[in-house]
Amino acid sequence: INQLKTSEDLEVYEMDYTNNQYLQEVCNIKQPVLFNYDSISPEFYEQINANSFTSNNNHDVKVKDIRDYYKGESIDYIVLPASSATNLMKTDTRSNYFTENNEDFIENTDLYHIFHSNDTHLKPQLSMITKYDIMTGSSKSVTPLRYHTDFRKFISVHSGKIKIKMTPWKSHKYLHPHRDFENYEFRSRINVWNPDKQHKNDFDKLRFLEFDITPGNALHIPPYWWYSIQFNDDSDTIVTSITYNSVMNCVSNLPNWGMYYLQQTNTKTKITKTLPIEITNEEVDDNSNKIDETPVQPEVEMTQEI
């Protein structure tokens, strides 16, 4: 029952980290908690920074387009090498792209042991599942407003700056929630940074916490609190996320996980679109010594699970 309890005070707590036990006691209040973490784990910030993508540029990351969240029910991501994703976001002038859910990227690079070293300071007792993530985005890009059902979720800023909007669970009646079991994401259909006319009336009824998080600080996001991140003007903003699921939390999530795995068994892959890339193939004809410029159009397949 405790896993389903929420706190509704529109207030962010600030604390001085002393030890893991005290952190867990404060987090059990289920309010957002902001604390300085650089002084506790300085190597975490020294070793994960704006170069973390460029130094591992051959490994793939998942890139999303925020516009997909407001165009339909299906959310597709594109897998790109880290170098290509970085260039895409640096040249994106419309603030559309961000990358997240990069567990594979972390596991396939030397970043995993750096994340793992934080468990001593952050991990609650009886945790069964631990997830690590690294995120960045185009200048002024945002993530959708959503909530999670994990036991603990910590985000931390390593470079640049983010602005975050948060609102408690009771706001859900105005947020048009969508439970997406295909991607296991519980989100709002409202863009809280730029609401459209259709949702303007409901948006005006909402109250938000809105504050900046600077490098060296970490935020505990309680379960069932709605939150959305806006990346700073600096395209080198790096944010990490560490999530823990306790035994009882796993039990409470079984119905949702069951729906997720059922959805996965009912999906099949189809080709959604192809990107024609026109290449000029210069072939020299030995007999005529003329160049045959034949346009070649290979197709790059992008897939979507439905």
Where are these regions (language model features)?
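N-terminal accessory scaffold of Fe(II)-dependent oxygenases
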Residues: 1-218, 228-306
